[in-house]
Amino acid sequence: MLFNSFEFLLFLPCVFLIYWYACRGRQSRNLWIVLCSYFFYGWWDWRFTGLLALTSLCSYASGIWEERYPRLARHILWSNILLNLGILGAFKYFNFFADSLQDLSTALGFGALHASVVHVILPVGISFYTFQALSYSIDVYRKKLPATHDLIEFFAYLSFFPQLVAGPIERATNLLPQFQQDRTFSYADAVDGMRQILWGFFKKIVIADQCAVGVNAIFSDYAQASGVDLLMGGLLFTFQIYGDFSGYSDIAIGTGRLFGIRLMQNFRYPYFSRNIRDFWQRWHISLMTWFQIGRAHV
């Protein structure tokens, strides 16, 4: 289910109204978030939800075991890291190696392999929730937060639909405690959330999608394009990719605000950066932060 789809425009108000007016208390709201998030994710392909649940269960158990068996905590952490990265790598690169195997099989005279053998669908957003799962395991290991024993709470943290498929990639120390607290409706938060959602839609539909028309027209026949056309196409592409990424992030942040959840800022005017280093501190901030912290402490 895409943010800029008719289905999402029906889905969001229904989830919002039931969340605030039918659910009572933290537990029921967390459960409602989990159910709606899995419905949202399963809209692409219901099989994706099984992988998300597996990742959630493994990381949930990892956190508890790290606390329960401190002498084995580092081994437990690395087992969870290798398992999650192994799953991510298998889905990310299976088709690449399968295509190579297909070519080798044909070259050796064995014929082409069946399509179902060599192609696997890449689950939407698998990188985002994998990194977020690892964030939790790392933070528990570093004693930045205690392991949660509430399964629904943890599932809500890892599957929260506004940022499930396109980020921001949240640190467990920021997002998980918000699901551990009671939340009350705030009119100011709702208004601010809607403002950010509309701004995100503007970036996506008015800027990114319109720039994409020009980019596709120029690069679909780049051999015949002039130097000026190619330069213009490159310029339009920079606005397209920014509008896509930051637009989706704004919609996610605004949607989170509707439910009393504050997500981190993900883009901070990257094209006004002074240098490359400054650019990467402003572009997809949550991803860059995750890599910096993960590299420093694992």
Q: What residue ranges belong to the model's regions?
A:
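Membrane-embedded transmembrane alpha-helical bundles that form the catalytic cores
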Residues: 1-295
